[in-house]
């Protein structure tokens, strides 16, 4: 890489840090090109990205973006995975790492909070934002359904009492 290109790369990585509330740092040593492309495609379908970064440039960009805490994560062959949706991204990366021993999750950052490998694996077990929204909507609709049932119950009970009375006579 030419010296003149490095500031542009630092700016690109810094903008990724600023625009993406969640970033996972991983070592990719031993991944084949087809495996990396497969991971990129699955991430792209979830509006996430995968970028191989040079450690020194990633550290400079992290400092520039105010993420000094993740500088220590950059060593060895490093890539960053970034997204606006942390849970979906974590699920994809953790599942890929399970099936591919050559991808090692080092750590990451979600909403400016540094996470270690274990925390990212725990994050991947959480429901996604869309799943949470659907559960909340279901919970909000359930009381309305119950209220409708309760309101209908007295009229149907009255009808049964009248029917029972009529059948006695």
From Swiss-Prot:
One of its GO terms (biological process) is translation. It comes from the Bacteria. Keywords: Ribonucleoprotein, Ribosomal protein, RNA-binding, rRNA-binding. InterPro entries: Ribosomal_uL10, Ribosomal_uL10-like_sf, Ribosomal_uL10_bac, Ribosomal_uL10_bac_type, Ribosomal_uL10_CS_bac. GO terms for cellular component: large ribosomal subunit. GO terms for molecular function: large ribosomal subunit rRNA binding; structural constituent of ribosome. PROSITE patterns: RIBOSOMAL_L10. SUPFAM superfamilies: Ribosomal protein L10-like. Part of the ribosomal stalk of the 50S ribosomal subunit. The N-terminus interacts with L11 and the large rRNA to form the base of the stalk. The C-terminus forms an elongated spine to which L12 dimers bind in a sequential fashion forming a multimeric L10(L12)X complex. Belongs to the universal ribosomal protein uL10 family. Forms part of the ribosomal stalk, playing a central role in the interaction of the ribosome with GTP-bound translation factors. This is Large ribosomal subunit protein uL10. The lineage of its organism: Bacteria, Pseudomonadati, Pseudomonadota, Alphaproteobacteria, Rickettsiales.
């Amino acid at each position: 890489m030419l010296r003149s290109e490095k500031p542009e790369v630092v700016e690109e990585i810094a903008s990724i840090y600023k625009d993406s509330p969640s970033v996972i740092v991983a070592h990719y040593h031993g991944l084949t090109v087809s495996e990396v492309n497969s991971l990129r495609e699955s991430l792209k379908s979830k509006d996430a990205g995968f970028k191989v970064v040079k450690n020194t440039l990633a550290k400079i960009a992290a400092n520039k973006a105010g993420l000094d805490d993740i500088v220590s994560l950059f060593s060895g062959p490093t890539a960053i995975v970034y997204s606006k949706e942390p849970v979906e991204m974590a699920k994809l990366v953790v599942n890929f790492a399970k099936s591919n021993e050559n991808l090692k999750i080092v750590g990451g950052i979600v909403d400016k909070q540094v996470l270690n490998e274990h925390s990212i694996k725990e994050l991947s077990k959480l429901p996604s934002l869309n799943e949470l929204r659907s559960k909340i909507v279901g919970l909000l609709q359930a009381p309305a359904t119950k209220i409708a049932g309760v309101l209908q119950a007295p009229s149907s009970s009255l009808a049964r009492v009248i029917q029972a009375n009529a059948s006695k006579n």
